[in-house]
Amino acid sequence: MDNSVLSAYSLWLTPSKGAALEELQNTINDISKRYSTPAFPPHVTLIGRISGPELMMMDRTATIASRIRQLRVAFGTIDKTDEYFRSLFIRIRKTEEIDGAASVARKVFGEEHRAEYMPHMSLMYADMPVEKKESIAVEYGLQGLAERIGSVAIDRISVYRTSADVGKWKWIRDFELGGFAEGINPNYGNDSRSWYSAKTI
């Protein structure tokens, strides 16, 4: 891959594998099938809409991951907006750990000017009236889901190449939190799996 080509990337805080992740993924998939909306892996965006050469992205993400310890994120209320990428989601409770992680990412990428960080975990992306989103939340008992799970452990940052078309999102690499920030081998990208593989937990 030509690392001089600029692309848009997103860094996600990804839940540890286990029953909670599987239940969240199944919920996203079920809503997707019923309402013909995109499916995607459960995640909390740490920072998005970052452009630059891919190798630089990997080096900076390694630095970020080395400065953040594994953490738990606690679920709050179910919310929805008229924005496509904030259609229906679980609010993540603000803590020093989650705000600190976002601060590290913004500093490394020189994006301190961004609006206040609002951590959340999306369950659906859709263009539909807010009232319909509310009815879907009730239909699937999403507030009960959030309360039952309570919180999830976060053990890695996942880097995705993203665009307005969710179907074209592509997983690039995972970085374990607290890992050593070593130089990235230019040949790291031999695994070309897409985000879709996240469905097979």
Residue locations for each model-derived region?
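A short, structured active-site edge motif that brings together acidic residues
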Residues: 72-82
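Basic, often amphipathic N-terminal segments
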Residues: 1-74, 95-148, 165-201
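Short beta-strand segments and strand-loop junctions that repeat across beta-rich extracellular domains
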Residues: 155-166
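A generic structural signal for beta-strand entry/edge sites
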Residues: 85-87
